[in-house]
């Protein structure tokens, strides 16, 4: 396709951009009465009063603009006009491409295709973000409409025989190939493959079917995503006498509503109450009922998933593929469904016995079995149910209540500003990159809580922009995300209108389109005695922020001439590597000690507290890895081979429960949770990528950073051998280079097995 979307958007001269950095770097801020010194970067996230005063000054003294400094984006009408004008520009570019006949035109053909792709991407990626994160519903609706319109045109282009044939002519002409850059040849090969995956050589009627099917999949997939947070019932009824006799705390039952008869408690399926019941109710039947209610989705959601799977079966059959997985895994690192299943099975074989041993304490507790009695893995796995995990884990944790208290204490060493500032310091040490606050113009952001960070390279200056939308907001998406709004690319030769993009300049004077990304999280704030509201991060939230910043660095440092292969526009089963590698930094005590300082005393985070936390992260970690492997196998199962005659009988919930029963380890044979597994749309047939990249990241960490997480040599190695290539270089070659294992360069089943043979993920 002309767009490779990832998991899953002013007037300026060609002179170097004058950075609108707030000139406060180095300025010190007195926090309350503690005497704590902070940097400007830290202050804009931690001091809500200061941020409010800055925002008011911005409103008073800066000029008006649109979202992301795009002057169109001041209203929903402007968004629609931007989409309309971009579509008009795309039509003109497509016509120029169709009429390319001279040698000079053919030499520039791939670059012009990339420009066409960029024109589409800048609308589709923008709308992907707006429909997910904008607080104004009218923007969400306008973005959905523009996305559908542009996505449909993209699918039309993907089946344009004239465009495809001319691209083939270019790639088969030795004289033209001689003058094309490596990037142009790579992009040409990618785009030709995308044409072929779209059934370009089939009859016109079939190509039209492809367009229609792709559009239907996009629409039903978005509906599926939009409904993953909903449970089947708002509450369930449990008999009062059974609940009262269960041994659960009367303080908890006193918080429950009763039905009209007074004979039943109404247990909600949202909030903290059902989670507290799972942790504290000794009655297994009640826990089972509550657990299933929390995991069940409405039948309509299963119907959406079934329809999504059916449409993908029809699409893959139309294109002559055995399965949707076959279709998706072309040109991925894995190469084939067989290799993916082999990787998952290898990982499961390593992990399953370790997971069983982790659950042994629950099995013994349930049976009151003495330590002297041997319990086989199968016996353990047949005894321990998913609704047991929270209850018995809570009993286990309650033996060390001080550890729980220390966990809560720990977060006050990690304000959001502390962590962002620490990330900047880390990036400076390993990559030569810093994050600097930048003043925004009126209308540049979609919420007053959004902070803009300019990404500054020691060698290149301004290399990108990150918009941080990190604080909780009503109606905001619940999952953290990295959105590519605008890709890095060199300015095209005939480009002279920079009003809708932000630009930078390389050290050699080359002008390029700045990569612009948005990081979206939902972190809560607390009120402090001095009247400020500050966000203190739990340790898992720190890991989340590091993960998303890993994606951001990939976007910033993967700076290629052409946007089709810049940053995160790479193989789906490679794209999570930089982000998961960052999780290792977030779990390293040396890094955490550098970042953490108490918000009142400025003392560094105590080593004992951090060690306690890191020890707790190992609790049931193999169960978590195995759970991810089951999800990856479900993804392969739902996108495996189905005959067209069988598609009406596809029942994703039955497939899910049957697979769970066979694979064991906290097997779910009670709920239809698969309807809440949103990645089945965005990562259809490629969810294994998460585990695969975890396994690779573990090996990269051990090779480059385990001995010293601040190692500049290791950072430069990862930057030069992985990050800077974006999607240009074969991922297996990148891995072979960074691990210094040449045999991995050819990929295939043996390489997949090597990666899958990992315990420490």
From Swiss-Prot:
Annotated family: Belongs to the peptidase M3 family.
This protein's name:
Mitochondrial intermediate peptidase
Extent of the transit peptide: 1-37
Residues binding Zn(2+) are 547, 551, 554
Keywords from UniProt, A to Z, are: Hydrolase, Metal-binding, Metalloprotease, Mitochondrion, Protease, Transit peptide, Zinc
Q: Which organism is it from?
A: Candida glabrata (strain ATCC 2001 / BCRC 20586 / JCM 3761 / NBRC 0622 / NRRL Y-65 / CBS 138)
Q: What is its EC number?
A: 3.4.24.59
The protein's matches in Gene3D superfamilies, at most eight in alphabetical order, are given as: Collagenase (Catalytic Domain), Neurolysin, domain 3
Cofactor(s) demanded: Zn(2+)
Mind telling me which GO cellular component terms the entry cites?
mitochondrial matrix
| Cellular localisation | Mitochondrion matrix
Q: What is its main location?
A: mitochondrion
Per its UniProt entry, what is the enzyme's top EC class, as one word?
Answer: hydrolase
- SUPFAM superfamilies recorded for this chain? Metalloproteases ('zincins'), catalytic domain (SSF55486)
Task: Spell out the coiled coil positions from the record.
Answer: none
Q: Name the gene behind this protein.
A: OCT1
Q: How is the cofactor bound?
A: Binds 1 zinc ion.
Q: Please give the biological process terms from Gene Ontology that the record holds.
A: intracellular iron ion homeostasis; peptide metabolic process; protein processing involved in protein targeting to mitochondrion; protein stabilization
What is its biological role? Cleaves proteins, imported into the mitochondrion, to their mature size. While most mitochondrial precursor proteins are processed to the mature form in one step by mitochondrial processing peptidase (MPP), the sequential cleavage by MIP of an octapeptide after initial processing by MPP is a required step for a subgroup of nuclear-encoded precursor proteins destined for the matrix or the inner membrane.
